[in-house]
């Protein structure tokens, strides 16, 4: 059972503050990208395992840090008994991303550029295409994938930001075909402004934020019970 917290008990942050927090974590507080990616991916996998039965899962990964979270999530999902396949439509030249690909491929997790031809046999899709630095609209090769996912009707779990959404304002339009309309979301570090009106299942992971950073920005952080890495946010 995931501990539940009130939406009123945590801060919702915009794009600029989210970027500032990341910048300070990597500079002033000495964190490495791969550290936070591992924590984010693990928290995402834990939320998925808490909310969905073990199954095949297609993990959509973009070329940036959100995609890296997806690779880590897939690796942990396999450890939790799921059967992940990764869709990686645009490869990154970043050495960290190359390492994440190797980690998954050597763990027998398929990595391919296109959606599986048997997509309808997957009960769950994990959306890790775009993070909080995304600015709409989406472009190829992502638009066709987003449209296909939307048309599939398969349950989608988004990591941090549903792909195609404006970080401040949320989904551009309910009628838009090239954005993700998820069934559940995990916010990372803190929820972004676009999640304020979200009423579906909403998890939060980010039990690593230094106290000094919290105090500097006047942030309301969740209280994580025991040694848990995730909480569930409700009204």
From Swiss-Prot:
Identify the keywords attached in UniProt to this record, alphabetized.
Isomerase, Metal-binding, NAD, NADP, Nucleotide-binding, Potassium
- Binding-site positions, (6S)-NADPHX: 65-69, 131-137, 160
Say which enzyme class the record assigns.
isomerase
Record function comment:
Catalyzes the epimerization of the S- and R-forms of NAD(P)HX, a damaged form of NAD(P)H that is a result of enzymatic or heat-dependent hydration. This is a prerequisite for the S-specific NAD(P)H-hydrate dehydratase to allow the repair of both epimers of NAD(P)HX.
Q: Which GO CC annotations does the UniProt entry carry? A: mitochondrion
Give the molecular function GO annotations.
Answer: metal ion binding; NAD(P)HX epimerase activity; nucleotide binding
Q: Which residues bind K(+)?
A: 66, 127, 163
Q: What is its EC number?
A: 5.1.99.6
Pfam families according to UniProt? YjeF_N (PF03853)
Superkingdom assignment: Eukaryota
Protein name (Swiss-Prot/TrEMBL): NAD(P)H-hydrate epimerase
Q: How is the cofactor bound?
A: Binds 1 potassium ion per subunit.
Report which reactions are catalysed by this protein: (6R)-NADHX = (6S)-NADHX; (6R)-NADPHX = (6S)-NADPHX
User: What positions does the domain YjeF N-terminal occupy?
Assistant: 18-221
Q: Which family does it belong to?
A: Belongs to the NnrE/AIBP family.
This protein's cofactor list reads: K(+)
Kindly give the InterPro entries that the UniProt entry links to this protein: YjeF_N_dom, YjeF_N_dom_sf, YJEFN_prot_NAXE-like
């Amino acid at each position: 059972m995931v501990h539940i917290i009130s939406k009123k008990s945590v801060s919702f942050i915009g794009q600029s503050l989210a970027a500032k927090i990341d910048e300070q974590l990597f500079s002033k507080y000495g964190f490495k990208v791969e550290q936070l990616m591992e924590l984010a991916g693990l928290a995402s996998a834990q939320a998925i395992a808490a909310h969905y039965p073990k199954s095949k899962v297609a993990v959509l990964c973009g070329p940036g840090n959100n995609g890296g979270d997806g690779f880590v999530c897939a690796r942990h999902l396999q450890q939790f008994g799921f059967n992940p396949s990764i869709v990686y439509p645009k490869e990154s030249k970043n050495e960290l991303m190359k390492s994440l690909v190797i980690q998954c491929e050597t763990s027998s997790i398929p990595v391919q550029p296109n959606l599986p031809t048997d997509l309808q046999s997957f009960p769950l899709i994990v959306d890790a295409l775009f993070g909080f630095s995304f600015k709409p609209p989406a472009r190829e090769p992502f638009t066709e994938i987003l449209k296909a996912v939307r048309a599939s009707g398969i349950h989608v779990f988004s990591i941090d930001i549903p792909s195609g959404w404006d970080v401040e304002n949320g989904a551009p339009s309910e009628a838009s075909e090239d954005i993700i309309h998820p069934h559940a979301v995990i916010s990372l570090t803190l929820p972004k402004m676009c999640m304020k009106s979200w009423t579906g299942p909403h998890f939060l992971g980010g039990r690593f934020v230094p106290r000094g950073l919290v105090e500097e920005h006047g942030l309301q952080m969740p209280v994580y019970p025991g040694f848990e890495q995730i909480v569930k946010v409700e009204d």
